[in-house]
Structures are given as C-alpha cells and as structure tokens.
C-alpha cells in the first residue's frame, strides 16, 4: 500500500511590493545553501534563507516527491485547522496549501469536484481571473491542466478530483499567458505556494513564506515563475 501525500484546500495571501527577477536571482537560487532533510524514501525537504532574492529577504521550502512511491489526494479541511494537524489526521506524510477560500464562510472560492460531486464553484472577482489552472488527481496520479469557466461548465468527470487554482505559470516548459489575470494580484508580492512537475518527473511542493518584514517578504507571479523554472519545473 502506497503512502499518501495531500494538497490541502485552503491558502491565504498577503500583499507586499513587486520587483523583477534577474540573473543574480538565478545564481542565488542555484548557489543557495539548501538545508536538505530526507523524510522518507522518495521525499526530500529543502529549505533555504536568502538575504536578498527578488530584492528582499526570502525563506523558501521545497518538498521533492518521487511519485512512484506515493499517492496524491485533495483533503478538504476546516479553515482554522492547521495544515500540519490536518495532514497528520489524514495519515499524509506531507501536505501543502492548495487553493483559495472565503475567510468568513470557510468554503473554497475555486472549483472543486470530487468523484463526480461538485463541492464548490469558482467565484467571480480577482481570484476568479487568476484561477486558470487545475490539479487533476485520479488513482493517486496527478496532472496539471489549463482551466476556464467553459471547462468548468462542461466538466462531467465521475471519477477523480479536480481542484482549480492559479494562475497557471508553466506548461511544457513554456510560460503561460497571464494577461487576463488580475494584475494587482499577479504583480504584488504575496506568500505563495506552487505545485510543480519537473523535467525529470518529480513533483515539487514549493512554499515561499511572507508577512515577515526583513525576513521573508514573498514573491509575485513572474518571480515565482522564474523560481520554479530554475528549480527544474516543466508544468
């Protein structure tokens, strides 16, 4: 029986300032002193601190998963439940925040369909414009897909899980068009998390911390796109 890795449904973002990625940022990521911990067979956790990455201090964590050893799933949990607590309760060996939610009501504001049942739909507004990608999981295997309101209306999948989020940054190694996304959300620094498929068929859970002035100030979407490309991302 394979162990389980879950994508937790909820994520909260907070704003900071924007800056462009540079060659120096690429070199900083490549030359970083990553603290590497082996959690289990096929699961490595890497963590690094940067005095200046994309113009500000950063704290970056990367979980590298060899998918043949693990099944992935989406866990729906209460907004006030800590990620680590929800992961432990579900029996997962690792977890990452996976999409956006309404802080008052607690429900997802992005489309979520699990085994033919629509749990939530994508809300209108800024988050609706950036929710142009989806995680599709079936029998523990994961794909990343482009998504739109048209796909959402037409979706009739009876098996597996679809969780919409975004913006989708890379497909087949090429940057995606994010011109239709809310530009304030795209260009403002936030704490961010990303799911990445690499060229060597690994899965990365990338977390960039924020909300900590002078220690970890977050990234915007172009910066996050640059980061996952340097880390070997394909999708």
Where are these regions (language model features)?
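Bacterial Sec-dependent N-terminal signal peptides
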Residues: 1-26
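Zymogen propeptides
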Residues: 21-144
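Residues that act as N-cap/strand-start positions at coil-to-secondary-structure junctions
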Residues: 57, 129, 163, 189-191
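Solvent-exposed loop/turn segments at secondary-structure junctions
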Residues: 69-70, 100-103, 151, 201, ...
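Hydrophobic N-terminal alpha-helices or hydrophobic patches in metabolic proteins across all domains
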Residues: 94, 232-234
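Domain-core and long-helix interface of multi-subunit machines
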Residues: 171-232
């Amino acid at each position: 029986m394979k162990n389980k890795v879950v994508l937790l449904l909820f994520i909260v973002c907070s704003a900071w300032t924007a800056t462009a990625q540079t060659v120096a940022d690429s070199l900083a990521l490549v030359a970083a002193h990553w603290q590497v911990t082996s959690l289990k067979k096929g699961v490595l956790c890497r963590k690094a601190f940067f005095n200046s990455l994309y113009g500000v201090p950063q704290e970056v964590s990367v979980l590298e998963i060899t998918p043949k050893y693990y099944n992935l799933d989406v866990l729906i949990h209460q907004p006030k439940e800590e990620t680590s607590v929800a992961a432990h309760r579900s029996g997962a060996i690792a977890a990452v925040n996976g999409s956006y939610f309404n802080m008052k009501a607690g429900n997802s504001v992005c489309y979520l369909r699990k085994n033919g049942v629509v749990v939530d739909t994508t809300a209108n507004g800024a988050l609706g414009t950036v929710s142009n990608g989806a995680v599709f999981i079936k029998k523990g295997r994961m794909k990343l897909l482009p998504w739109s309101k048209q796909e959402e209306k037409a979706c009739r999948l009876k098996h597996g899980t679809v969780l919409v989020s975004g913006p989708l940054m890379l497909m087949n190694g090429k940057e995606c068009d994010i011109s239709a996304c809310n530009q304030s959300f795209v260009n403002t620094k936030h704490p961010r998390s990303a799911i990445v498929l690499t060229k060597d068929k690994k899965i990365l859970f990338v977390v960039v911390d924020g909300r900590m002035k002078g220690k970890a100030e977050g990234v915007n979407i172009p910066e996050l796109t640059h980061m996952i490309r340097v880390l070997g991302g394909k999708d």
